[in-house]
């Protein structure tokens, strides 16, 4: 469950290391985001020479969440950390690599490029 002020790890090679959620997209009263949801975030920590720098405002999709998500068969999938991937307006990732596993629920939200780059889909 991601809300405003939540810090997330960045799971791609854009140069950002940590981002902080500043808005959950999808309605004026929406408070929380989970796996597959899009947020607006500010880059809080970045590596030198990366695509993005500290202070940039970016769009991200949540790929891992400590809260987890319930599947139709009744099982739950949850992760050890909150992680996001920086995306463009057309839902494609800004980076060329994805680090760590991602949830299968991204397929329902049509993030096929992220799924194809990910080393493991759970």
From Swiss-Prot:
Keywords: Ribonucleoprotein, Ribosomal protein, RNA-binding, rRNA-binding. Signal peptide: none annotated. Binds to 23S rRNA. Forms part of two intersubunit bridges in the 70S ribosome. InterPro entries: Ribosomal_uL14, Ribosomal_uL14_bac-type, Ribosomal_uL14_sf. One of its GO terms (biological process) is translation. This is Large ribosomal subunit protein uL14. GO terms for molecular function: large ribosomal subunit rRNA binding; structural constituent of ribosome. Disulfide bonds: none annotated.
